[in-house]
Design a protein with these regions (language model features):
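A structural "domain/chain start" motif
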Residues: 21-94, 204-213
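Short secondary-structure boundary motifs at beta->alpha junctions and helix caps
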Residues: 81-85, 147-148, 163-205
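Extracytoplasmic/secreted envelope proteins and their assembly/folding machinery
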Residues: 93, 97-101, 105, 126, ...
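Short secondary-structure transition/capping segments
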Residues: 59, 152-167, 201-213
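Surface-exposed short loop/turn segments
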Residues: 102, 106-166, 177-184
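Short connector loops/turns at beta-strand edges and beta->alpha or beta->beta junctions
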Residues: 66-72, 129-131, 173-178
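Bacterial N-terminal signal peptides
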Residues: 9-17
């Protein structure tokens, strides 16, 4: 048996003992103002968007990112084992907040701080975090097979009218870290990759809303 075959066998054995490598259904924490309009999307996500309404807004208030970890989540387990600190959570929340601010600004919208007509509010909660297994994620064969060890994050988010609180869009999603480009060589690289993807999607939705004005 050559070295490549031996490595593949070793990787397969390791992967057999790992849970949660595939898409998971994200639990609902109660953070969103309304879950009733959510519909299933790709990768077990739940989504809702009123495209016509979204296009009417000219600016956004971005609330501080919350953390809502339910019992049994990977984040709770990591906290109990000393693998996830309050500083980690704060740093990741700030990272996501900055990514959202940039997405909004790059799309040509104003960042606002007071409720007023024509302004929407963005609310986001991180609902789970999975630390990157740096040793496993660094093995190319493991990444090719399943994306194992790349870490990730889960969130609930909504856009609501800043005056009425009416929900304009919402999403509930768990996302693994990216394999291309590879993000597995830092403890929270996978979680940040997921957040970057969420911010990128927000930018895309805002661009689409602008084009429909």
């Amino acid at each position: 048996m050559n070295k490549t075959s031996v490595l593949m066998v070793m990787v397969s054995v390791v992967l057999a003992g790992i849970c949660g490598c595939g898409p998971e259904k994200t639990p609902q924490t109660g953070f969103l103002s309304d879950y009733s309009k959510l519909q299933e999307g790709a990768n077990s996500s739940l989504r809702y968007i009123n495209k016509d309404a979204l296009g009417k807004y000219t600016g956004f208030i971005v609330d501080p990112i919350a953390a809502r970890f339910l019992a049994g989540t990977k984040a709770v387990k990591a906290k109990s084992e000393g693998q996830l600190s309050e500083q980690d959570i704060s740093d990741l929340a700030n990272y996501l907040h900055s990514a959202i601010i940039k997405a909004i600004s790059d799309a040509g919208y104003k960042i606002e701080y007071r409720s007023s007509p024509g302004i929407a509010r963005i609310r986001v909660a991180i609902t789970d975090l999975e630390k990157t297994n740096v040793a496993l994620a660094a093995v190319p064969q493991a990444r090719m097979l399943t994306g194992a060890g790349v870490g990730g994050a889960a969130m609930e988010a909504e856009i609501v009218d800043s005056m009425t609180g009416k929900q304009i869009a919402a999403v509930v999603e768990t996302k693994a870290g990216s394999r291309v480009p590879f993000t597995g060589l830092s403890d929270w690289g996978g979680a940040k990759s997921a957040m970057d993807e969420w911010a990128s999607r927000l930018r895309q939705r805002l661009d689409e809303a602008q084009s429909q004005r």
